[in-house]
Amino acid sequence: MTVGTPDVVTAISMVKNDEIDKFVALYEEEIIKDNTGKPIRVKTLGQKLYVDSVKQHDVTFGIGPAGTGKTFLAVTLAVTALKRGQVKRIILTRPAVEAGESLGFLPGDLKEKVDPYLRPVYDALYQILGKDQTTRLMEREIIEIAPLAYMRGRTLDDAFVILDEAQNTTIMQMKMFLTRLGFNSKMIVNGDISQIDLPRNVKSGLIDAQEKLKNIHQIDFVHFSAKDVVRHPVVAQIIRAYEPAPVKVEEKKQETE
C-alpha cells in the first residue's frame, strides 16, 4: 500500500487529537478502485462514520464544511452500488440557485445551465469511472444529472440519489426531494450550513430537516468538522477560523423565525 501526503497529514492530525489508535481502521476496507486502479478508502474517522451510515440507512445526511469529501464519497458509494447491481441508476441533483444568481440568467440549454454548478460531481465521476464511461452512462440515462426542480412528481425506485448543496433548499424543496424515495433506493443529502445562499428570511430546508427528521429510524445525520478536511492542512485552519460566525448567524435566524 502506498502512503501519500494526505495519509501523513491524517496521521499527524489523529495524533494531535489522541486518536492514532483508530488510524489503522481507516485502511481496513477499500470502497472501490478509481479509473486508474488506485484504491479509494476513507481518510478520516468522520468519513468512516459517513460510509458506515450510508450502508446502514435509507437516507443519510452529510453535514459539514467544504473539503471533507462529502460529494466525492457520495459519488463513490453510488458508483459502487451500481457496479454491484444493487441499484439500476444514479441520480445527482442540487438546487439551481446559488449566491443570488438564478439559472434563468445563464445562457444555453438546461445541461449548460446546470453544469457550471456541478463540477465537483463531474470531477468525482471522471476520477472513478473515467470521462468516456461517464459519458456513455449518461447517454444511456443510467447516470442522470438534473436540477432539483426536475425531481417533482417522480418516484425514484432502484436508484442511488444524491442531493448536493442541500443547505440551499427551501423547506418545501427538501420535503419534495425526500418524498421521491422509492423502493430499493438510497438517498444521500449533503450540505454545509455555513454556506447558505438563501434570502435571510428563508429558512434552509437542511436545517429544518435536522429538526424534524432526527428521530426517524432509517434516517441518519453525520456531522463533519474541520478535523475531516482532506485538503491542504491550512484549509482546516481557515474553516476553524470562520466557524463561530456562521453558527451565530444561523442561531440569530432561527431565533427570529
Regions found by a protein language model. Give the residues of each.
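Conserved helicase motor core of SF1/SF2 NTP-dependent helicases
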Residues: 35-163, 167-257
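Interdomain "pre-motor" coupling segment immediately N-terminal to P-loop NTPase/helicase cores
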Residues: 1-27
